[in-house]
Amino acid sequence: MSIDPRVDIGHVHLKVSDIDRALAFYRDILGFDVMQQMGDQAAFISAGGYHHHLGLNTWESRGGSPPPAGTTGLYHVAIRYPDRRTLGEALRRLVDAEWPIDGATDHGVSEAVYLRDPDG
């Protein structure tokens, strides 16, 4: 059995410890637009006007710690910028914010910069 090729991922929710800190990263550094915010409990962010690509919430995680190494869970999320210029602009914001960068590579089909969000 194979999944229908028209299926896509509508959005992903991330449990974060602090909405303001998460928005400072996803909005101010990576460049996402805030589509809706529910105080300090949740924010829904998007690129291009979609209702939300990422949900950020503190419903079960306010003030929490990142999971310890060696545990299961989400490994990474790839955010594709449309071209090198736009990726470069995001990289410039990361550098200006002195955000730690874990690495970078050219996959042949895409170029990647690896980093961790405020919650690891």
Model feature map: region roles:
Residues H11-H13, H51-L54, H76, H107:
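Histidine-centered active-site/metal-ligand motif
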Residues F44-G49, S65-G70, V113-Y114:
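Short glycine-biased active-site loop of nucleotidyltransferases that positions the nucleotide triphosphate
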Residues G63-T105:
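Aromatic/His-enriched, Gly/Pro-containing loop or helix-boundary segments
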Residues M1-I3, L91-G120:
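Vicinal oxygen chelate
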